[in-house]
Each structure stands twice: as C-alpha cells, then as structure tokens.
C-alpha cells in the first residue's frame, strides 16, 4: 500500500516541482501512533525556504484532493530533507563527493555493516568511503547495490 501511494504521489508532485525548479528528494507515507503522514521532501541547488514548501504543499494538496488516491485520513508535510539528507539516487552520491556520509549495507563488507566517513569516490557502481578505524585511515569500496540506506552525516 505504502509503495503504491508514494509512486502515485510522485507522479502528481513531479510536474509541480518541475515548474518551480525543485528536486524531489523522497516521499514517505507512514503511520505514527493513530495518524498517517504523507511527507514530501524537496530541495534545490540553493536549498528551499518556507515559501517554496508552502507553494508545493498547496498545489499538491489541491491535486490530491481532486484525485483522492489515499483512502486514509493523513497529514501532508512538505519540507527540506535537512542537513542529513538521504542519498537515494546515484546523482545524490555524485553531488556528495567530499562530504561526510553515514551508510548501512545489507550484508557485511570487510566485517562491517555500518560506515561513516568521507565519500571519496563514486563511479556509478562502487562507493568509496574514507574512514578512520581506531587510529588508521582506511578506504572501503562498497558496491552500490549493497547499500541499504545512506545519508549525509553532520560532524562537529
């Protein structure tokens, strides 16, 4: 159900975002407690502000009300993905070269399933993370298809 909803919402949202020159980062349709939430995460080269989120929310809400593809009552939230934005597409990895990332894999690679470090390289098939293990710097090559989830990581 959730995948069907997000696919439908993506089809409805994309023309709105294209008109505003915004990027669709992710869509979530989740139940938290008794309530359902439809979360749409948007971004652009220069980030997004509250006015852009409001424009997308109003336009998308109108389309959703017309088509009525979701049977449950839900809250629509449109926002920026934040500082720790998810890396979902290959283009996200390319744009994030040199930045700190946090990544989980489906199966262990070099004995680990969790990686945090600098995104050093991405060739479209393999992600190379430069990380510190104990006191040594280490480069780990992770096949793209083995990545369960990835996001930017804020370090202090």
From Swiss-Prot:
Keyword Cytoplasm in record: yes
Pfam families per UniProt: DUF150_C (PF17384), RimP_N (PF02576)
Keyword annotations: Cytoplasm, Ribosome biogenesis
Classification via SUPFAM superfamilies: YhbC-like, C-terminal domain, YhbC-like, N-terminal domain
Subcellular location: Cytoplasm
GO annotation, biological process: ribosomal small subunit assembly; translation
GO cellular component: cytosol
InterPro entries: Ribosome_maturation_RimP, RimP_C, RimP_C_sf, RimP_N, RimP_N_sf
HAMAP family cross-referenced by the UniProt entry: RimP
Role noted for this protein: Required for maturation of 30S ribosomal subunits.
Membership in a protein family: Belongs to the RimP family.
Protein name: Ribosome maturation factor RimP
Organism field: Bacillus velezensis (strain DSM 23117 / BGSC 10A6 / LMG 26770 / FZB42)
Gene this chain is encoded by: rimP
């Amino acid at each position: 159900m959730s995948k069907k909803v997000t696919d439908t919402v993506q089809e409805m949202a994309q023309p709105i975002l294209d008109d505003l020159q915004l990027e669709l980062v992710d869509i979530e349709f989740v139940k938290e407690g008794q309530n359902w939430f439809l979360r749409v995460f948007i971004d652009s080269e220069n980030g997004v502000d509250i006015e852009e989120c409001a424009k997308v929310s109003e336009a998308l809400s109108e389309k959703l009300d017309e088509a009525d593809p979701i049977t449950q009552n839900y809250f629509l939230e449109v926002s920026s993905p934040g500082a720790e934005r998810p890396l979902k597409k290959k283009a996200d990895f390319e744009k994030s070269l040199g930045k700190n990332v946090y990544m989980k894999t489906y199966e262990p690679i070099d004995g680990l399933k969790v990686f945090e470090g600098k995104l050093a390289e991405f060739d479209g098939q393999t992600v190379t993370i430069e990380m510190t293990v104990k006191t040594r710097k280490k480069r780990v090559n992770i096949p793209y298809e083995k990545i369960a989830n990835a996001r930017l990581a804020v370090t202090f």
